[in-house]
Amino acid sequence: MTAWTLHTCDRLEERYWETHHPCGLRILVSPKKFSACYAVLGVEYGSRDRFAGGAVPMGCAHFLEHKMFERADGSGWEDVFAALGAEVNAYTSDDSTAYMFSATEGISDALEALLTMVSELSVTSASVSRERQIIAEEIRMNADDPWEVVYANMLRGLYAPTGNRQQDQGHPLRLAF
């Protein structure tokens, strides 16, 4: 790794350290006096990202976010983190996907688990089929949430037909990628 650089914001009384791993991963560390430790691993790939020709279906980033939680043996990473006394979660936005955990002990083991989780992808036909159903249910739940409906309508009104106005999860009729 390269040297660490200290960044400060006097106005907010915040500081964080930054370095870059040889693989290109940008690492930020912000020491806090909390009883719990929080770690976030984010990638710059979100719901609006496309490749030439639109070859990536809408909702692909969200689908991959979900799939990262499944282990090769079919079990879930949630169980691994729970056994370590940690909580794990993730989210997909229009421009990024982030995986995170919080823990009060066993931080090194939880960090190792997070790095392993995002490094190993297990996809089978059966797991894709199961995940489609889970994401379809998420989409239905959001369609029944007034706040989500207002937000989606606002995006459609503000943006031209681009990824910014689309649902992060994809469209229920297009879940058959």
List each model region and its residues.
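His/Glu-rich zincin catalytic helix
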Residues: 1-76
